[in-house]
């Protein structure tokens, strides 16, 4: 059972073009609809 692989079922926020690795979220609120965890949704 590998948690790292399980997380890839979700669209990986970390591979999203707007992902901010420092804040661990995406820079724009509208990225909600693109499958990225936004900084302020």
From Swiss-Prot:
Q: Name one GO cellular component term.
A: extracellular region
Molecular function per GO: sodium channel regulator activity; toxin activity
- Principal location class: secreted
**Record note on modification:** Contains 3 disulfide bonds. They are not added, since framework IV presents two different connectivities (I-V, II-III, IV-VI and I-III, II-V, IV-VI).
Q: Which UniProt keywords apply?
A: Cleavage on pair of basic residues, Disulfide bond, Ion channel impairing toxin, Neurotoxin, Secreted, Toxin, Voltage-gated sodium channel impairing toxin
Q: Does the keyword Lyase apply?
A: no
Q: Which residues form the propeptide?
A: 1-24
Tissue expression summary: Expressed by the venom duct.
* Entry annotated with the keyword Secreted: yes
What family name appears in the similarity comment?
Answer: Belongs to the conotoxin M superfamily.
Know the name of this protein? Mu-conotoxin pn4c
């Amino acid at each position: 059972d590998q948690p790292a692989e399980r997380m890839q079922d979700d669209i990986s926020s970390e591979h999203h073009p707007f992902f901010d690795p420092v804040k661990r979220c995406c820079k724009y609120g509208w990225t909600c609809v693109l499958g990225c965890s936004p900084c302020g949704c």
